[in-house]
Amino acid sequence: GIDHYLFTIQSSASELLLNNQNMVLQSAEDISAFSTPEAYRYSELMKNIKIANSMIEDIYLYYPVWDYIVGTEGCYNSRNYFLLNSGLSSKGYAEWKSHILESDNINFFFSPLGKNEEKLYFRQQIPASRERDPQSILIIGVNDTEFMRLLDMALPNDDGTSIFVLTEEEQLY
C-alpha cells in the first residue's frame, strides 16, 4: 500500500545522503566542487531515482554553506535552481527558501503552496541532530497526483471512510 511507497522514498533518501559524493560536497573547500563530473553524476543519480519512482516529483540536496543545490535539474545556486523549476519566475522564492530549505521539519511534512494548496515533502539532513547546523539537506517533493491516486486506491468505495496522515509531530491531515 501507501506505506510501501513512502518507505521507498525514505530508503532512496538514505541512499543519497550516505552517498560518498554527498560527503565530498558537504566538506567542499570552494564552489568549484559543484561543477565536477562527480557532482553531475550525483545529479544524474537523482534523476534516475525520480524516473523510477512515480511518487517523486523532485529530489535535491541543499548545501547551506554555499547556498548551492544539486538536484534532478543539475547543480545551481538555490535561486537559479528555483527559477529553473518555476518557469523563471522568482515569485515564491523567499517562501520556498524559508519553508522548505531552512525548515525545521524532518521526515514527511506538508507545506502550504498557495491559498488552499498543500504539498507533501520529505526532508532529512546531516547531521540529523538539531544542535548543529546542517551540512546537507535532502528534499524530496512528492507528486500530488500520484499520492492522491494511491489514496483513492487505498479507500474502499463506500463513502464513510477517511484516511488520516499522521506526521511525527502528531499533526493530523
Question: What role is predicted for each listed range?
Answer:
Residues 41-53, 128-173:
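Solvent-exposed, extracytoplasmic
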Residues 31-42:
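Signal-transducing coiled-coil linker helices
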